[in-house]
UniProtKB/Swiss-Prot annotation:
Gene designation: glmU
Family label: In the N-terminal section; belongs to the N-acetylglucosamine-1-phosphate uridyltransferase family. In the C-terminal section; belongs to the transferase hexapeptide repeat family.
Pyrophosphorylase: annotated span: 1-226
Protein name per UniProt: Bifunctional protein GlmU
GO molecular function (one): UDP-N-acetylglucosamine diphosphorylase activity
Keyword annotations from UniProtKB, A to Z: Acyltransferase, Cell shape, Cell wall biogenesis/degradation, Cytoplasm, Magnesium, Metal-binding, Multifunctional enzyme, Nucleotidyltransferase, Peptidoglycan synthesis, Repeat, Transferase
Subcellular location: Cytoplasm
Length: 454
């Protein structure tokens, strides 16, 4: 059966106390709405319709995509009114209603819900809670059939004692929706058009009301304030940690690991505490990541090591390569197999060949460095003249003396050597020693200056 999905994302979120629309607040590096959209796509609907209101343009700009239809709710008059704004775009046999501030809902849960929907059958996602305060209550008759949903503010004391709550997520037969929405009334405490009122209409029309529940109640937890947002974050990270450990990853402390994007992992990977992965990260078998590292949009090949306090973005470490501690690899940094980058070394758009080494205190930008080349401490590639960037090229087996400055554009042939403290401004032929510094002079009888008396 065909499917349209409507995502309600028009709320202001006043309790967030933020200029940012509520649905754009992040969980694990993605907006809450972004998570919901990603889950919706897994269901392969014919259309995804996002109802926006507060901060509409910011939401539209952030989530803009060819497969999303944005619908404006100019006035926030309730959930029923919000869905009604999308009606002209709905044509599928089933319509699924989701919420932009409920980011942890799982696609498998929604598939089970949708499996229960038919022309004469509507499906609700409900949840059993110890404290259902704030949730609409699922009212059933003596036979256990759902007959209505009563919002918390409108519920009687007896109804508030019900522990089965309405998550707001429901799937309905598309052919019935327009009629039900057209009959909604705002005669309630809030003065709003409640989507939940369609349940009583469906019962009156003789439809069966099916229910489904999530595996985990946190799937349907929304975020109305910063505390709830933090709770969603920690639950998401806990879920990710369990999945990674099941795939053969050792997390020294699962509570001190954050994924803010997506990761592919091999087996026997070790990740120490306070590691953050962002964007798309690929980690192959046997990789070790030390504590306090941030790795973004990078690939770590088999057996690579990232030592403590290193920051990688847009980088690649070859098999058996290592970097750190305190290394910074910026976009375009590539370490060949068994290459080594040590402490306080920064690479940007630089390639180190197999077995090349830059042990400490260096900046290597816009550089191509051949296999087995050794970069001495304090080496700088001077790649910027104030207007343009230039490349430095070193062949295989080059030896760069400590505290050398290589003024690009410059090329050093295979086996070339620079003396410590040299400023290299011209190409160095293969096998040559280049010295670019003043000759040392020793001055006998030198008297150090003394402080003048005041």
């Amino acid at each position: 059966m065909s499917l349209d999905i409507v995502i309600l994302a028009a709320g202001q979120g006043t309790r967030m106390r933020s200029a940012l629309p509520k649905v754009l607040h992040p969980v694990a590096g993605n907006s809450m709405l972004g998570h919901v959209v990603a889950t919706a796509r897994q269901l392969q609907p014919q259309g995804i319709h996002v109802v926006i209101g507060h901060g509409a343009e910011r939401v539209r700009e952030r989530l803009a995509a060819d497969d999303l239809n944005f619908v404006l709710q100019a006035e926030q008059l309730g959930t029923g009114h919000a869905v009604a704004q999308a009606l002209p775009a709905l044509s599928a046999e089933r319509v699924l209603i989701l919420y932009g501030d409920v980011p942890l809902i799982e696609a498998d849960t929604l598939r089970r819900l949708l499996a229960q929907v038919g022309p004469e059958r509507l499906a609700l996602l409900t949840v059993d809670l110890v404290d259902p305060s704030g949730y609409g209550r699922i009212v059933r008759d003596a036979a256990g059939r759902v007959v209505a949903i009563v919002e918390h503010k409108d519920a009687s004391p007896e109804q508030r004692a019900i522990c089965e709550g309405n998550t707001g997520i429901l799937a309905v037969p598309g052919a019935r929706l327009a009629d039900w929405l057209g009959r909604l009334s705002n005669d309630n405490v809030q003065g709003e058009y409640y989507l939940t009122d369609v349940i009583a209409m469906a019962v009156a029309d003789g439809l069966t009301i099916a229910t489904e529940q999530p595996q985990d109640a946190m799937e349907v937890q929304g975020a109305n304030d910063r505390l709830q947002l933090a709770q969603l974050e920690r639950h998401y990270q806990s879920r990710v940690a369990r999945r990674l450990m099941a795939q053969g990853v050792t997390l020294r402390d699962p509570a001190r690991f954050d994924l803010r994007g997506e990761v592919e992992v091999g087996r026997d990977v070790l990740i120490d505490v306070n590691v953050i992965l962002e964007g798309k990260v690929i980690i192959e078998d046997g990789v070790e990541i030390g504590p306090n590292c941030t790795i973004k949009d990078s690939t770590l090949r088999r057996g690579a090591q990232v030592k403590a306090n290193s920051h990688l973005e847009g980088a690649e470490l070859g098999e058996g390569a290592d970097c750190g501690p305190f290394a910074r690899l910026r976009p375009g940094a590539v370490l060949g197999a068994k290459a080594h980058v040590g402490n306080f070394v920064e690479l940007k758009n630089a390639v180190l060949g197999e077995g090349a080494k830059a042990g400490h205190l260096s900046y290597l930008g816009d550089a191509e460095i051949g296999a087995r080349t050794n970069i001495g401490a304090g080496t700088i590639t001077c790649n910027y003249d104030g207007a343009n960037k230039f490349r430095t090229v070193m062949g295989e087996d080059v030896f760069i003396g400590s505290n050398s400055a290589l003024v690009a554009p410059v090329e050093l042939g295979a086996g070339a050597t620079t003396g410590a403290g040299s400023v290299i401004t011209e190409d160095v032929p293969a096998g040559n020693l280049a010295l670019g510094r003043g000759r040392q002079r020793n001055i006998e009888g030198w008297q150090r200056p003394t402080k003048q008396k005041k």
